[in-house]
Amino acid sequence: MNADSIRQMIETGLPGARAEVRGDDGVHFEATVVCDAFAGKLPLARHRMVYATLGGKMGGEINALQLRTLTEQEAAA
């Protein structure tokens, strides 16, 4: 698994999302995801939305994913 594959999965699974994913070892990644669908949702709900885009890859091909989830307005602040 690589960072670009994860970015594509997130952006495909969350229409309108922009994702920046980093990770050099192939199993530990950091991602910043900006999506207006996060508006009004608590951080845990936002993270679950992102995890849902990754299917069964979490805990397998992706060992760890540190998330920062923002709306467009939060990202602009």
Name what the model sees in each region.
Residues 1-26:
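N-terminal first-folded block
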Residues 17, 25-29, 61-65:
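A generic structural signal for short beta-strands and their flanking turns/coil linkers
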Residues 22, 32-34, 68-70:
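Solvent-exposed beta-strand sheet faces enriched in polar/charged residues
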Residues 26-28, 38, 72:
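Short active-site-proximal "capping" loops at secondary-structure junctions
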Residues 29-33, 75-77:
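Short, solvent-exposed polar/charged micro-motifs at secondary-structure junctions
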Residues 32-45:
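A short interface-forming secondary-structure element
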Residues 44-77:
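C-terminal structural segments of small proteins and small subunits
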